[in-house]
């Protein structure tokens, strides 16, 4: 695999790409990484690559030098990636996907960013390594190279180790132990010494689930949702309890009352209805009002009792034709969903 990195600081990558596993992989020919200076394509005598933006402060990389730099190395099957906090969050799945590419061009941002016209013209995808801003995109490029390199045959000494690392199967990796058997009075779990590979595998899976639920509930719920049995009929959908300590009523404007009522009947149960009024729980009520043109989406916040209810709610919503939106960040089980009329439901569950 070949990777070209475009930045204003090509020397930034010298040490990381010469040492550790990446350096060994490059020496052995499993991976080729080249760092190129965007200033080589700068304009005029002074090789200008940046200018002040029209609509803000600071400096911005100009479109022409960036476009020329990309086109000088781009091939027919190249994939150009811009490292940006606005991009898709990097994951193990995305890293594995990128590792199958024959040639990647990684574009590092600098200053306040890059002229949008360069991104529109040449960039195939934007990737972020997290919800924070760095002084430049060089560190992000290194993170991406390191993450995807693990999935390139010949880079790791033991390729199987990549399959058991944290997040590879959507869960955090469980605890690891080596010699001595007892350290400061604490012993290695007996199951790891029994020699029964199936018992060990079951133990690893269980502690992995427990650790993920404790430390990353967002990942746990995502894993649980993706691996839960598919629900196909109304009878398969158990009742979901909604937490509502306060009194409130919500009016939703719908274009087809019969269709909307059917959707919510299957979501929350027919026994909850009184005419066009839906009782979610206790004093909480939802009114459906038919209108030819709605005044825009209404946002409803709903909190569920357990993480199992949270997963079932999302599964049921999707099966009945609702749309799943963005997943919350920061480890909190939160999801935005849309009903048949475009109204927004922000769904969460109680934190215990």
Swiss-Prot record:
Major localisation: cytoplasm
EC number: 2.1.1.228
Protein family according to the UniProt entry: Belongs to the RNA methyltransferase TrmD family.
The protein's assembly and partners: Homodimer.
GO molecular function: tRNA (guanine(37)-N1)-methyltransferase activity
Binding site for S-adenosyl-L-methionine: 109, 129-134
Top-level taxon of origin: Bacteria
Catalytically driven reaction(s): guanosine(37) in tRNA + S-adenosyl-L-methionine = N(1)-methylguanosine(37) in tRNA + S-adenosyl-L-homocysteine + H(+)
Annotated keywords: Cytoplasm, Methyltransferase, S-adenosyl-L-methionine, Transferase, tRNA processing
One Pfam family cited in the UniProt record for this chain: tRNA_m1G_MT
Record GO biological process: tRNA N1-guanine methylation
UniProt function note: Specifically methylates guanosine-37 in various tRNAs.
Cited PANTHER family: TRNA (GUANINE-N(1)-)-METHYLTRANSFERASE
Protein name stated in the entry: tRNA (guanine-N(1)-)-methyltransferase
CDD domains: TrmD-like, VOC
InterPro entries in the record: Alpha/beta_knot_MTases, Glyas_Bleomycin-R_OHBP_Dase, tRNA_m1G_MeTrfase_C_sf, tRNA_m1G_MeTrfase_TrmD, tRNA_m1G_MTases_N, tRNA_MeTrfase_TRMD/TRM10
NCBIfam families hit by this protein: PRK00026.1, trmD
GO CC, one annotated term: cytosol
Locations listed in the record: Cytoplasm
């Amino acid at each position: 695999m070949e990777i070209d990195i475009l930045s204003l600081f090509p020397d930034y990558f010298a040490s990381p790409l010469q040492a550790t596993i990446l350096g060994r992989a490059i020496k052995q020919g499993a991976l080729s990484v080249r760092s190129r200076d965007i200033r080589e394509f700068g304009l005029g005598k002074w090789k200008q690559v940046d200018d002040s933006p029209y609509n803000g402060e600071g400096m911005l990389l100009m479109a022409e030098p960036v476009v020329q730099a990309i086109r000088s190395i781009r091939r027919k099957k190249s994939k150009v990636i811009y490292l940006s906090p606005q991009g898709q969050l990097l994951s193990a799945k995305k890293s594995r996907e990128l590792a199958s590419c024959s040639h990647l061009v990684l574009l590092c941002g600098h200053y306040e960013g890059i002229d949008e016209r360069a991104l529109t013209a040449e960039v195939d995808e934007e990737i972020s390594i997290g919800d924070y801003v760095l002084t430049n995109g060089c560190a992000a490029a290194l993170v991406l190279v390191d993450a995807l390199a693990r999935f390139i045959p010949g880079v790791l000494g033991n390729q199987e180790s990549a399959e058991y690392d944290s997040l590879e199967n959507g869960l955090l990796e469980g605890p690891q132990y080596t010699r001595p058997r007892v350290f400061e009075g604490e012993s290695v779990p007996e199951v790891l010494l029994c020699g029964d590979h199936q018992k060990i595998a079951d133990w690893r899976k269980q502690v992995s689930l427990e650790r993920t639920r404790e430390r990353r509930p967002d990942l746990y719920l995502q894993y649980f949702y993706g691996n839960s049995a598919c629900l196909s009929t109304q009878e398969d959908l158990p009742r979901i309890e909604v937490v509502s300590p306060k009194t409130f009523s919500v009016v939703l404007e719908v274009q087809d009352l019969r269709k909307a009522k059917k959707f919510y009947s299957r979501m929350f149960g027919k026994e909850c209805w009184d005419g066009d009024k839906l009782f979610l729980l206790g004093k909480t009520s939802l009114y459906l009002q038919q209108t030819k043109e709605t005044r825009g989406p209404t946002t409803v916040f709903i909190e569920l009792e357990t993480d199992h209810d949270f997963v079932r709610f999302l599964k049921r919503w999707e099966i009945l034709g609702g749309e799943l939106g963005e997943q919350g960040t920061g480890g909190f089980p939160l999801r935005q969903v849309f009903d048949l009329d475009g109204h927004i439901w922000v769904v969460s569950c109680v934190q215990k």
